[in-house]
Amino acid sequence: VSDDFFMYDQSPAARVGIYYYENGAYPRKPKVIYDRNHSSFFSLDIDEIPEEVYTASKCFHTTGITLALNEDIRETTIEMIKRFKAAGTLVSFDVNFRGNLWTGDQARECILRILPYVDIFFCSEDTARLTFLKTGTAREMMKSFTEEYPISPLEI
């Protein structure tokens, strides 16, 4: 991990997204509250990212959570993935599906768009079955991903 490319939001409304974790007391589960709307990340424009970020990086990692946040972030992230890949950077992606952010159909449609650019792929067995409609053993499901896309699966 490098800090060579920090970006600062200079706008007067700049703010960092944050989350709050509330412990649960049995039988209530813990609760996480996300406060990320209108954060600087939500207003990131692809043209604000210096070209050197793509060419100097060795690995770029992102998740399905990022893609699920909203359409602007999704398209910016997809374009970043393409630019990192074009620059020869290793692209790592963790599906990390969250049903409270988008549907399985939405996730599948979007993620299938980026898989041709992904080198390292993380996907749970449940997500492979429910979101990508894969069948068979965990090994067979991951093999099917590698037969369809140029990825190295690390988890199922």
Please tell me what each predicted stretch does.
Residues A87-V95:
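Short beta-strand/loop segments at the ligand-binding rim of alpha/beta enzyme cores
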Residues N37, I65, N96-N100, D126:
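Active-site beta-loop-alpha junctions enriched in small/polar residues
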Residues A87, L101-I156:
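Conserved phosphate/ATP/ADP-binding segment of small-molecule kinases
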Residues T66-E75, T103, T131-K134:
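Glycine/threonine-rich flexible loop motifs
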Residues I78-K85, T146:
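Surface-exposed amphipathic alpha-helices with a cationic face
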Residues V1-G64:
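Conserved N-terminal subdomain of the carbohydrate kinase-like
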Residues F42-I49, E75-E79, D105-C110:
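Active-site glycine-rich loop that binds ribose-phosphate moieties when present
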